[in-house]
Amino acid sequence: TAADGSFTLPGHERERFIFITTPSGYKTFNRHYHKIEEKQSGYDFGLMPYSGRIRKDGSHKYIHIADTEIFNTENHEDWVNNVRDYARNEQAAFIIHTGDICYEKGLKAHIKLMNTENMDCPVFYCIGNHDWVKGKYGEELFESIYGPVYYSFDAGNVHYIVTPMPGGDHAPGYTADDVCRWLKNDLAHIRPGTPVVVFNHDLLTYE
């Protein structure tokens, strides 16, 4: 990485995204990832200062939800609005959903209800076993809506990591080795003593 922020990556044939670890105190202009395009050689990530609901000492709260398993956008506004209002009242820095959004209809509907703009704070998603659906590979639809299935971000004084399960209702397009390779690289850049929290729907491996 150069002083002006430009970077060069050798690439990896199994990767479909380029993504960054959003640093604490900032947010991306649009999103933390870009899909790798065959004819595209440059990718830019715009960051802007963002304190969110993080205290000066770095401490913060977050809301963790899972298994909402919706199939449409009807009759869900009330509970989604309750989560949003609770996040505001508790000054939650972000919301994390750790999977089982649920099947094709749920994957397409959930993002319309619970997203960063609607919830008034960053919203992150993790894939669950019922979020692998029929396609070229199980997470294809999830990736097209929510982005990569493994990534990390910083909030306050904590490093957060999102990892997928080994598989679900349909075969994934990655292996545990792919995720572990990335995870080792991610952790190698963490300052010693930094608290680390890992989110997943179920363990990547039981070994």
Where are these regions (language model features)?
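Active-site neighborhood of phospho(di)ester-bond hydrolases with catalytic His/Asp-centered motifs
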Residues: 64-66, 94-100, 122-129, 163, ...
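N-terminal active-site segment of His-dependent metallophosphoesterases
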Residues: 22-24, 35-109
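Short, surface-exposed beta-strand/beta-hairpin micro-motifs centered on an aromatic residue
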Residues: 2-11
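Long, structured stretches of catalytic cores involved in phosphate-ester chemistry, encompassing
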Residues: 194-197, 204-207
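Extended active-site neighborhood of metal-dependent phosphoesterases/phosphodiesterases
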Residues: 23-26, 107-195
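Short, acidic/polar N-cap/turn motifs at the starts of alpha helices
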Residues: 30-33, 42, 148-152
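A short, solvent-exposed loop/turn motif at the edges and junctions
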Residues: 15-35
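Active-site-proximal beta-strand elements of phosphoester/diester hydrolases
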Residues: 59-72, 157-167, 197-200
